């Protein structure tokens, strides 16, 4: 591939290099795909159909790039260890994945986790979602924030920052709260344990947010080594959200323990109208006000088109 074909003239006016699918796929080089169809199935989101071709075209080159960055980071740590006479702890490499509701962040995170964990260089890769750092339902209700759930104000950001600081300082057995999508709440006294991984993937809506609280001197992004933003046009995102909502009405919402069980008896038209209103009043608003403005802060942007296929990749120079 000729360099002139890869780097467009317009790239000189932006901080990003832009690649189409074919150009990006060529950067996989000879890296083999070890993932099988059977391995892929449990990694997919509720409303996603993603092929092994998508994994090899988009995610394998990305995993290859990230491994280069990790190797460089390890070299820097070796220099620091030598300078400090061996007194610095192991520092995990933190990757963040941001983007809108329904864009497929969780699927991207799980696929990347699988690829990085099965790389020729054996590495321990943990995955944590920021959902666990939402305020409990009771607190959101008291603060009248239920309609702002998913907005930056609905997260216990200081708790998340303390969690990341502990991870970066090399602490053992750091606890992360667990969120239940069934009950729409934090599960009391249950935690994921993160014990000094080589790589931590942090997935969530607002992980690139720099916050509105001017007294905060530290942000989630301060602890992140490589940031990814999964992007798509809003009309596409809304369509995916409505389709997912319809499927939930016929599955998860029918569970008597579901917080949203009152949606289970909606007709299809009622469900479409309800999902559309939720998008317009909550998710779409959060996208415009808080999520989309952080996109250009990412190290890499995956721009999706129809069927969750990535059409463009933008890599920060």
Curated annotation (Swiss-Prot):
Family matches, as InterPro entries: P-loop_NTPase (IPR027417), PanK (IPR004566), PRK/URK (IPR006083)
Principal location: cytoplasm
EC number: 2.7.1.33
Recorded superkingdom: Bacteria
Reactions the enzyme catalyzes: (R)-pantothenate + ATP = (R)-4'-phosphopantothenate + ADP + H(+)
Pfam families: PRK
Keyword terms of this UniProt record: ATP-binding, Coenzyme A biosynthesis, Cytoplasm, Kinase, Nucleotide-binding, Transferase
Pathway(s) of this molecule: Cofactor biosynthesis; coenzyme A biosynthesis; CoA from (R)-pantothenate: step 1/5
Regions annotated as coiled coil: none
Annotated positions binding ATP: 99-106
A Gene Ontology BP annotation from the UniProt entry: coenzyme A biosynthetic process
Gene Ontology cellular component terms for the protein in this record: cytoplasm
GO molecular function, one term: pantothenate kinase activity
Subcellular locations according to the entry: Cytoplasm
SUPFAM superfamilies: P-loop containing nucleoside triphosphate hydrolases
Assigned protein family: Belongs to the prokaryotic pantothenate kinase family.
HAMAP family for this protein: Pantothen_kinase_1 (MF_00215)
Annotated protein name in UniProt: Pantothenate kinase
Organism for this UniProt entry: Histophilus somni (strain 2336)
UniProt gene name: coaA
